[in-house]
A protein has these predicted regions:
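Outer-membrane beta-barrel translocator/pore domains, especially the C-terminal barrels
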Residues: 73-449
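Flexible loop and strand-edge segments within Gram-negative outer membrane beta-barrel domains
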Residues: 1-68, 72
Length: 449
């Protein structure tokens, strides 16, 4: 039996709005939450049982705290066989409103509370042939809502899904190198079921850059299961050279066989099925790391996602330069783009001191998104840094459209207050946090990413 407590609470909902956030999350950097959860887990043979209470405190007074799960019960069972594996999962959650006294909710929204029951039953078979492996995974998803508002009737929903995968692995070795080739073919289909009448409790979009990238999991949460049908071919190459350098190459081709009616219903518009090609290339050595990744829509003739960068690690200097581009960011809306370049520098000086600096610039609006420079110090027991920073925040968030609509003037005022230069001081007592020589650079990682 294991117990986990992850609980934080602030007396002032605006106290942590100045926390720095990753530039790659710029579309959602308005959101800061404190997790408040207690859970207990028990593993007995092939059964896993867990019970939890989970909630969040929003550190933005105009964004809802969301719902509290009190409780959430999970049951999982898995039975392994010689060629077939059976699995079953069940989840029961009782949702209540975690009220934010700054934000007014209409009565209709306030009544959308109740219970959700979700189960998944399926099996997977794996056959090992001479030159390839065949995997077939089939499952049925069942969900049912019991809402406190008796005027709202929610039907139970059963959603079948199947995935067929053919994969192989080839290797080649020589005196100074070792290579792996991994081809893979995938067919996946999830049947469409109308879920528009179901409430949304803990649904959150995965920020992969757009809804139709080379992934199958579109959402966190269980309130919407997108219908999908596609064919995917993937080729991976991994090569190690002289035990000091690594080369990774991947190319993916994906053809969607139908559009997703569930996602189109959520966006209230029609996004047609697509045909895409993507690639990912990276090279790493002792002093150099370079990478390139892109995803291109052939039918729309649009670059959905792209990033390239180089990182140079010298004995006393670390230099990073990158360019990132993506369109159709789900956290903003269905049609938009982010295009920015990042530069950062870390220079070690004598006796543990360091100079740190960096800038991120939006190439579309020709404006600086974030910049910083300063000094830091780190030894075996203490680390601190003092630096000046300037950041321009974004207020747009599709998931909280109503909070923008009814508090637009307050949002603009808050943005104007936060979008100013500041002096930051941070310190860490490494003896209390388990620091050691292997974690020497961890203190500076958030600024360098």
């Amino acid at each position: 039996v294991t117990t986990s407590i992850d609980w934080a609470k602030s007396s002032d909902s605006m106290v942590l709005l100045d926390l720095p956030s990753s530039l790659t999350s710029i579309a959602n950097q308005r959101d800061h939450y404190l997790r408040q959860s207690v859970s207990m887990n028990m593993l007995v043979n092939n059964f896993l049982i867990s019970i939890a209470r989970e909630g969040f405190q929003s550190l933005n007074p105009f964004i809802n705290n969301g719902f509290i799960k009190k409780p959430e019960l999970n049951l999982e069972y898995q039975q392994y066989g010689p060629s077939v594996t059976y699995f079953a999962r069940a989840n029961y959650s009782n949702f209540d409103i975690n009220k934010n006294h700054y934000l007014l909710l209409d009565n209709k929204t306030a009544k959308q509370i109740g219970k959700r029951f979700f189960t998944e039953i399926g099996a997977e078979t794996l056959q090992d042939f001479r030159y390839f492996d065949l995997s077939i995974n089939g499952s049925f998803l069942y969900k049912k809502y019991d809402l406190d508002d008796i005027k709202i009737n929610s039907k139970s929903t059963t959603i079948p899904s199947v995935e067929i995968k053919i994969s192989s692995l080839f290797s080649q070795s020589s005196e100074d190198s070792f290579s792996l080739f991994m081809p893979e073919f995938v067919y996946q289909k999830t049947t469409y079921k109308d879920q528009s009448a179901d409430p949304i409790f803990d649904l959150h979009q995965r920020n992969f850059g757009n809804f139709n990238r080379l992934n199958t999991k579109y959402f966190f949460g269980k309130d919407r299961v997108p219908d999908t049908e596609f064919l995917l071919a993937r080729l991976k190459l991994q090569k190690r050279i002289n035990n000091s350098s690594r080369l990774n190459f991947q190319i993916i081709k994906k053809n969607e066989l139908q559009e997703s009616r569930v996602i189109n219903s959520m966006l209230n518009q029609s996004i047609e099925k697509d045909s895409q090609i993507g690639t990912n290339v990276s090279f790493e050595s002792e002093i150099l790391r370079a990478y390139f990744a892109a995803n291109y829509s052939q039918k729309r003739n649009t670059l959905n996602f792209g990033q390239t960068g180089i990182e140079i690690q010298l004995p006393e200097t670390r230099l990073i330069l990158s360019r990132k581009f993506q369109t159709n960011v789900p956290l903003l809306n269905s049609k938009n783009k982010l295009d920015y370049v990042e530069f950062s520098l870390e220079r070690s000086m004598s006796e543990g001191y360091k100079f740190i600096g960096g800038i991120s610039k939006d190439l579309d609006s020709k404006k600086n998104l974030e910049s910083y420079f300063g000094f830091g110090f780190e030894n075996c027991c203490l680390a601190f840094k003092i630096y000046a920073s300037d950041k321009r925040l974004s207020k747009y968030n599709l998931l909280n459209f109503h909070s923008l609509q009814f508090n637009n003037a307050s949002w603009d005022k808050m943005i104007s207050i936060e979008n100013k230069s500041r002096i930051n001081f941070e310190f860490e007592l490494k003896g209390l946090t388990g620091g050691n020589n292997n974690k020497r650079n961890r203190f500076f990682e958030p600024l360098m990413k």
